[in-house]
């Protein structure tokens, strides 16, 4: 009887400790701009409990890019993953900084209906693009410019890449710009793969982790824990392809063969260091100035702060 009572008390004590650890978790709201895999480290960190292990109760809220940036500025959320668009907002005075970069190149594919055979055939046609004149729009224009077709197309917002994919399937759009997994699915379904932006556009830090300057100053430890969780998620995905493929299969309800292709695609554009140099940031500032035809006075330190990420990288032996 005594042994049974002691065991019962032990189980009760462990349960109370577990409940206490749950209640101690700090709420954090992160807004990816798409349900797709452009921000896969965030989705993976949530599903595989990397945030929870850092004492964070992460709420992942998919928001259109412009909505997410506005919500971040007003304090409704803590982070957005729309790195490129947030950088554009920062050069216009928004108090935002990128603190982690996951993609040095945008994994954006322009896919078309089967009767369109090359980029030049897009002249005079509509192209569906996710977001609302954010980074994806400018990347599509830059890729089209490479083929001399940027002046004669009409870019139309599809809201997000999932909507773009369904618009292509339903025949509502001659062409759309898609990220994985939708780009891979569309290719396998026979839609024309016209161009991959990463093949013709230089470094473009489209996706990462962005927060406000105020949070960087006032909540450095919380930012550190979010960065730790994301770095762990990235390292997990790189070291365990089979596990990551299973995650993609579950998350997007796709066959293993397709998930394998999706994995390879996202690894090709992953920024392995998760950091950017001042030179790389300046390249993006120069691109923004050229695309918007404005003079930009913002410095690299005004739009990015990788100090904490560098510290965590050293901690992980990166």
Q: Which role does the model predict for each range below?
A:
Residues 7-20:
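Bacterial N-terminal signal peptides
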Residues 24-170, 174-180, 193-203:
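Short, glycine-/small- and polar/acidic-enriched structural segments
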Residues 1-5:
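N-terminal secretory signal peptides that target proteins for export/translocation
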Residues 218-296:
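Secondary-structure end/capping motifs
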Residues 32, 102-112, 189-219, 223, ...:
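Periplasmic-binding protein-like
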Residues 84-85, 162-252:
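Pocket-lining segment of extracytoplasmic ligand-binding domains
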Residues 135-151, 229-261, 301-304, 308, ...:
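Ligand-binding clefts/hinges and TM-proximal coupling segments of bilobed small-molecule sensing domains
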């Amino acid at each position: 009887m005594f042994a049974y009572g002691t065991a019962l008390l032990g189980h009760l004590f462990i349960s109370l400790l577990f409940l206490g650890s749950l209640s101690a978790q700090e709420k954090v709201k992160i807004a990816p701009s798409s349900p797709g895999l452009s921000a896969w480290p965030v989705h993976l960190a949530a599903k595989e409990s990397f945030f929870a292990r850092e004492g964070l109760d992460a709420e992942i809220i998919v928001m259109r890019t412009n909505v997410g940036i506005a919500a971040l500025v007003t304090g409704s959320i803590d982070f957005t993953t729309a790195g490129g668009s947030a950088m554009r907002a920062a050069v216009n005075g928004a108090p935002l900084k990128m603190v982690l970069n996951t993609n040095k190149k945008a994994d954006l594919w322009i896919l078309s209906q089967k009767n369109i055979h090359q980029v030049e055939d897009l002249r005079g046609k509509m192209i569906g693009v996710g977001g609302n004149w954010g980074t994806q729009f400018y990347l599509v224009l830059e890729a089209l410019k490479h083929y001399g077709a940027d002046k004669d197309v009409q870019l139309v917002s599809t809201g997000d890449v999932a909507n773009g994919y369904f618009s292509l399937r339903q025949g509502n759009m001659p062409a759309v710009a898609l990220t994985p997994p939708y780009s891979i699915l569309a290719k396998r379904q026979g839609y024309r793969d016209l161009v991959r932006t990463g093949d013709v556009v230089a470094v473009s830090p489209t996706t990462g982790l962005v927060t406000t300057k105020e949070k960087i100053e006032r909540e450095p430890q919380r930012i550190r824990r979010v960065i730790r969780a994301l770095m762990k998620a990235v390292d997990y995905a790189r070291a365990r392809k089979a596990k990551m493929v299973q995650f993609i299969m579950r998350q997007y309800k796709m066959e293993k063969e397709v998930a394998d292709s999706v994995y390879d695609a996202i690894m090709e554009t992953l920024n392995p260091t998760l950091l950017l140099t001042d030179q790389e940031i300046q390249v993006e500032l120069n691109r923004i100035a050229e695309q918007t035809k404005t003079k930009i006075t913002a410095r690299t330190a005004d739009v990015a702060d990788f100090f904490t990420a560098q510290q965590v990288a050293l901690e992980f032996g990166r």
